[in-house]
A protein has these predicted regions:
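Structural beta-sheet core signal
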Residues: 54-55, 116
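Binuclear metal-dependent hydrolase catalytic cores
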Residues: 1-54, 60, 65, 129-154
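Cap/insert and terminal regions of metallo-dependent hydrolase folds
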Residues: 60-149
Length: 154
């Protein structure tokens, strides 16, 4: 079903650290996140509004990518579980972070908008509430914990 869209709606493009592309009319720079488990990339996109949107990839932020992340208006960061449940979900073994750590990072970097994603799924009904409550203890910007398929304007 999905394969029929390969090469049309779905396109794969091999990138290297620092490569630039234009996507949806916006300049995008890809960066190697420095993963120790597999080659992975994050990206930063200059939105038409002039805002900078950055995704650090599927692992916690790595300081080697500071030059790409600094000055971001939006940060998309994985937050696998609540800090208090790290013993249960073992995010570090999976190369992931907790809500607390993602929020502390965004606060430290002065990012005004933080969107958390890639979470464990045992708290789906109350995930937004629980993650927001924990996150607001460490981050004082605009915190977004979207439900699956939720959309909003950035």
């Amino acid at each position: 079903k999905v394969c029929k869209h390969m090469g049309e709606r779905i396109q794969f493009d091999v990138v290297k650290d620092g490569d630039n592309r234009t996507i949806l009319g916006c300049p995008v720079t890809f960066f190697d996140i420095g993963s120790t488990k597999a080659k992975q990339f994050g990206f930063t996109m200059q939105l038409k509004s002039g805002k900078k949107f950055t995704c650090v990839g599927d692992e916690p932020y790595n300081e080697v990518d500071y030059k790409y992340v600094k000055g971001s208006d939006w940060l998309l960061h994985e937050a696998f579980c609540l800090f208090g449940e790290a013993d249960k979900f073992k995010p570090y073994e999976k190369h992931h972070s907790t809500v607390k750590e993602a929020c502390q990072l965004a606060e430290e970097l002065g990012v005004p908008n933080l969107l958390l994603y890639h979470t464990e799924e045992t708290h789906l009904a109350e995930r937004k509430k629980l993650y927001t409550e924990e996150g607001q203890q460490y981050y004082h910007g605009n915190l977004y914990v979207p439900d699956d398929l939720e959309t909003f304007e950035i």
